[in-house]
Amino acid sequence: MERRRSERVKVNLKAERISGDERYAVFIENISEHGIHLITASSHAHKKYSPGKELELKLQLPTGEKINLLCKTQWAYSRIPPEKVTDSIGLEIIDPPLQYIKFVRALHQSS
């Protein structure tokens, strides 16, 4: 049974995970209107990204424009590609802003 509310689109976008005064670079691999799959350098993901934990993401669009997103971690695990270890995290977007939804819908139309 499919649990996602909307279809995902593969992307290659930069973002920042914001935690208080600290910022962490992350890369977004795919998105939907209500979710994001991101990867980041391995750094104890299960502590920073434990399921249910809320976090803020600042997503940079290809135009250079930035969108702030409040998200909730759904899952996190480490993966080991041939070159390096990364953390893979699934996020649910809490109340996605209209600007973000329009961006995702435009991606669907162009793919």
Residue spans for each PLM region:
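N-terminal helix initiation/capping motif
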Residues: M1-H44, R105-S111
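Extended Gly/Ser/Thr-rich low-complexity repeat segments
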Residues: K47-L59, I101-S111
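Short conserved beta-strand and strand-loop elements enriched in small hydrophobics
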Residues: L13-I18, S50-K66
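C-terminal output/interaction extensions
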Residues: P81-S111
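Short beta-strand-centered aromatic/proline hotspots
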Residues: A25-I28, L69-A76
